[in-house]
Amino acid sequence: MTTAITGGQLITGLGTDPIPNGTVVIVGDRIAAAGPATDVPIPTDANTIDASGHTVLPGLIDCHVHSTYRARDVKQHLLNTPSYNILRSTQIIEETLACGITSAREMSGADAGFREAINEGLIPGPRLQIAILMISQTGGHGDYWVPAGMHIPKRAWLRSPVADGPEEIRKLVRHVLMAGADFVKICTSGGITSVSDSWDEPQYTVEEIRVAVDEAANKGKGVAVHAEGTSGIKRALEAKVHSIEHGSVSYTHLRAH
């Protein structure tokens, strides 16, 4: 199937100025040509979409999404069945694609089945890179303990993300990689939504973080860290992680350290 998108302002994403009257030709699932209408011939068998008055641009990449997080209503969360929450998540994934996001890093909550369902065309959605779990220390940002004395699993289809000490972390990292994670995510600071910690307190030692980095490297994978406070960011950098998520301090401050 061949499709031509015509008449719209075209942003190629190559650093050039927008093209006022652009044409994009798509053959199958590949962009065959893109540029000014005068330079891009339209195949005779193409289905044409008139984009006049609109802007056409490449798909966007969202580097931090949680496709399975919708409601903050804890009572409702506990009343929903896991299957209901999974089916509701497919709506979020479809909405993400409808926003023009064609690739996304899923930062915990979705297992490999979400990624494979999209890849096989079972549900519409962006290409996903998944972390599966957000690994956390006891009492950390990913430990969903509440003062009533219970642990509330945010996603009943996933195992507990809590691990303490190098060997527990090593084992849990091995598990998420076995389960199909594209990268590993751990928490090196608290978070603004946590019940039992503060966003700026450090979590995990450098040694513990480095174990995660080394284990992921054995599989050719990287480590992303949830890090909001300065101390947690410094520890993550010392352990040579691959990305800092949130990073609520200035770049100048970090560079000075």
Go through the PLM ranges and name each one.
Residues T3, L10, L14-L57:
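Histidine-rich, glycine-flanked metal-binding segment
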Residues G8, D29, G53, H64, ...:
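Divalent metal-coordination and catalytic microenvironments
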Residues H54-E120, T138-Y144, E207, A239:
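Metal-associated gating/positioning segment near the N- to mid-region
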Residues K75-I86, P153-R170:
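Active-site mouth loops of central-metabolism enzymes
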Residues I86-I92, G165-H175, G229:
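Short, acidic/polar
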Residues L87-F114, G125-M134, A181-S194, G222, ...:
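Divalent metal-dependent hydrolysis catalytic cores, especially in the metallo-beta-lactamase
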Residues P124-P126, L133, E201-K221:
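Alpha-helix-loop-beta-strand connector modules within alpha/beta enzyme cores
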Residues T252-H257:
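Conserved small/polar residues in nucleotide/adenosyl-binding loops
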